[in-house]
Each structure stands twice: as C-alpha cells, then as structure tokens.
Amino acid sequence: VRPLVGAEYAALGINDPQGRIERFVTSGMDDETRRRIGPLPEGYGLLGLIIRENRSFRIADINVDPHRHGFPPNHPPMSSFLGVPIAVQGVSLGRLYLTNKLGAAEFSPADQALVETFALHAGIAMDNARLHEQLQRLAVVDERERISKDLHDGIIQNLYAVGLSLED
C-alpha cells in the first residue's frame, strides 16, 4: 500500500488477542535502520490511539500532535501520518501505518479511502491465513488421534492374541 498512496514509510502492526502489538513489519526502511531503532513499538502515542479508538487517523504533522509519544533514538524523521485499523467482522487484527506523504504536505481523504479499502482486503487475507493455520493444527490433531486409535486397537488385538496363545 505504501507505493499506492506515495508514502515514504509504511508499517503493518499485528496485534495479539489483548490488542498489543506482537509483530511490526516495516516497508521503506532498510534492515540496518530498523535494527538500530531497537525493540518493537509498544503502542503508545499515535499507534496506541488507533489501537484504543479502532478508527482511522490522518494527521498533517505528527511532531505537533498532542497524542505524540516521541521517537526512539536512530528513528528517521516523520511528519505526515495516516493510520488505519484492520478488522474482520468486528475483530481487530492489526493496523496499517503510513508516514511522510511524498509530493504533498499530508495524506488526502482519497489516500485514506484507498488505504481503508486495502485494510479491508488485508483483514480478509489475514483472517483466511489464521483460519488456514487453525485447520492445519486441527488436521495434525486429527491425524495424531487416528494414529493413537490405530495403535490402541493394534495393541488390544495383540494382547488378545497373546491371551489366546497363553490359554492354548
């Protein structure tokens, strides 16, 4: 989505069931810069605002926004901001964060609409991936249960055969 709206940086924050950021995937930032920044964001400031209010925010300059929490050392400068929640059937899965609109002072309402549509599709894809993962786990459990029953039945048959042999 970063090139679609002309953002210098983008991130996908995936949250755990409690709403905290558990994965933070960045785009537009090289690995060395990402490493120097340090640990994942914890969801304070603007990132936390989107988590708490679960709605989109378009901000012209995050450096003067009252919700700003600040940047860690070695973080690249950022100004314009667009944050959009990702949800499916009312369940929050994560957020898209975009910063530094290229060629304009801030993100437009059209940019926001595009990212919200993208977030809808991303939410469906993320939900499908989670469902697929759950199905794989269930398949493994089913297979283990089948093997367990086969072993159990085989052992019972062997014990019965041994019992018959002993009676003989």
Place the predicted regions along the sequence by residue.
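Coiled-coil dimerization/phosphotransfer module
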Residues: P3-V25, D30-P41, L49-R52, I59, ...
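Active-site/binding-pocket entry motifs
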Residues: S56, V64-R68
